[in-house]
UniProtKB/Swiss-Prot annotation:
PANTHER family found in the cross-reference section: MITOCHONDRIAL RIBOSOMAL PROTEIN L24
Complex and partners: Part of the 50S ribosomal subunit.
Cited SMART domains: KOW
Family according to the record: Belongs to the universal ribosomal protein uL24 family.
Gene3D superfamilies: 2.30.30.30
GO annotation terms (biological process): translation
Signal peptide (UniProt feature, chain positions): none
UniProt name for this protein: Large ribosomal subunit protein uL24
Keywords: Ribonucleoprotein, Ribosomal protein, RNA-binding, rRNA-binding
Function according to Swiss-Prot or TrEMBL: One of two assembly initiator proteins, it binds directly to the 5'-end of the 23S rRNA, where it nucleates assembly of the 50S subunit. One of the proteins that surrounds the polypeptide exit tunnel on the outside of the subunit.
């Protein structure tokens, strides 16, 4: 999976198409990520004593990575990303449009 925590992404498909946000959490096993303020769902919760009140809670649901594109920090555009090895053997991600190293 090429998206990591704290990456800025653009939603390219689905009900929130066109929205941007930051990746809060990645689920590599299922190829899904949580993006701040995107794909909001409502969950009804019961009261649990005095510690937790009943009500409708709005939270983010995971999105599949195929519906997202990384926003390149250098060219400020949604970009396809690839990986390459540097001379010291370290693997890094790079933007395929501007050819700049992302991390």
């Amino acid at each position: 999976m090429r998206l990591k925590k704290n990456d800025n992404v653009l939603v390219i498909a689905g009900k929130d198409k066109g929205k941007t946000g930051k990746v809060r959490y990645a689920f590599p096993r299922t190829d899904r990520v949580l993006v701040e303020g995107v794909n909001m769902i409502k969950r009804h919760s019961r009261a649990r004593g005095q510690a937790k009140q009943a009500g409708i809670i709005e939270r983010e649901a995971p999105l599949h990575v195929s519906n997202l594109m990384l926003l390149c920090s250098k060219c400020n555009k949604p970009a396809r990303i690839g990986s390459r090895e540097l001379a010291d053997g370290k693997s890094v991600r790079y933007c395929k449009s501007c050819n700049e190293v992302i991390d």
